[in-house]
Amino acid sequence: MPQLNPIPWVFLFFLVWLVLGFLGLQKFTSIVTTTLDDSSEEVEVKSKEYSWPW
């Protein structure tokens, strides 16, 4: 079995993890921003509809 050069494999390994981390972070930030936008809109709507709940 021939001896493989480890440098390209290490580079590809880190490149794949960098891409996966970037995509995961992008997905996570999009979910967080949508939930924050939804919650802020709900708070505004609730405060307008039910200003005095009792």
UniProtKB/Swiss-Prot annotation:
Coiled-coil stretches noted in the UniProt entry, renumbered to this chain: none
Statement: the UniProt record of this protein carries the keyword Transmembrane helix: yes
Xref: InterPro entries: ATP8_metazoa, ATPase_protein_8
Keywords: ATP synthesis, CF(0), Hydrogen ion transport, Ion transport, Membrane, Mitochondrion, Transmembrane, Transmembrane helix, Transport
Subcellular compartments: Mitochondrion membrane
GO CC terms: mitochondrial membrane; proton-transporting ATP synthase complex
Transmembrane annotation, as ranges: 9-25
Functional description taken from the UniProt entry: Mitochondrial membrane ATP synthase (F(1)F(0) ATP synthase or Complex V) produces ATP from ADP in the presence of a proton gradient across the membrane which is generated by electron transport complexes of the respiratory chain. F-type ATPases consist of two structural domains, F(1) - containing the extramembraneous catalytic core and F(0) - containing the membrane proton channel, linked together by a central stalk and a peripheral stalk. During catalysis, ATP synthesis in the catalytic domain of F(1) is coupled via a rotary mechanism of the central stalk subunits to proton translocation.
Highest taxon of the lineage: Eukaryota
Any one Gene Ontology molecular-function term assigned to this protein's record: proton transmembrane transporter activity
Family of this protein: Belongs to the ATPase protein 8 family.
Record-level GO BP terms: proton motive force-driven ATP synthesis
Entry protein name: ATP synthase protein 8
Topology in membrane: Single-pass membrane protein
Subunit structure, interactors included: F-type ATPases have 2 components, CF(1) - the catalytic core - and CF(0) - the membrane proton channel.
Taxonomic path: Eukaryota, Metazoa, Chordata, Cephalochordata, Leptocardii
Main location class: mitochondrion
